[in-house]
């Protein structure tokens, strides 16, 4: 059983509110869950304290048990200082192709 910490959508049409839940990864997004850890209201301003509420003790306990946070929940935990999110960069993307490299070298010489 693969356990994940993820967001389950609640609220009404055009007014989403998300519950942060622990669930089996095979369960539907808004379906059965094991435990509710908090909530996230994306409609509130980013500086509002009520935008995100998490029970950090429960979150740490589930992470210790091996629960995998979703990408969005990992961002929340990284901002809270609970877990460190690995950077997702592609260093090869910044390397110029041959034509651009030649043009860049010519521009540097001029």
Swiss-Prot record:
Entry keywords, A to Z: Ribonucleoprotein, Ribosomal protein
GO molecular function annotations of the record: structural constituent of ribosome
Composition-biased stretches (Basic and acidic residues): 90-103
Any one Gene Ontology BP term: translation
Any Pfam family matching the protein: Ribosomal_S16
InterPro entries: Ribosomal_bS16, Ribosomal_bS16_dom_sf
Entry similarity comment: Belongs to the bacterial ribosomal protein bS16 family.
Protein known as: Small ribosomal subunit protein bS16
């Amino acid at each position: 059983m693969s356990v994940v910490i993820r967001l389950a959508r609640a609220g009404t049409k055009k007014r989403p509110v998300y519950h942060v839940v622990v669930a089996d990864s095979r369960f539907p997004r808004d379906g059965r869950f094991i435990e509710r850890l908090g909530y996230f209201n994306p409609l509130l301003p980013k500086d509002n304290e009520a935008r995100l509420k998490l029970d950090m003790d429960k979150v740490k306990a589930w992470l210790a048990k091996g629960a995998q946070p979703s990408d969005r929940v990992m961002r929340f935990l990284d901002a809270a200082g609970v877990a460190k999110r690995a950077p997702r960069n592609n260093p090869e993307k910044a390397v110029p192709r041959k034509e651009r490299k030649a043009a860049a070298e010519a521009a540097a010489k001029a």
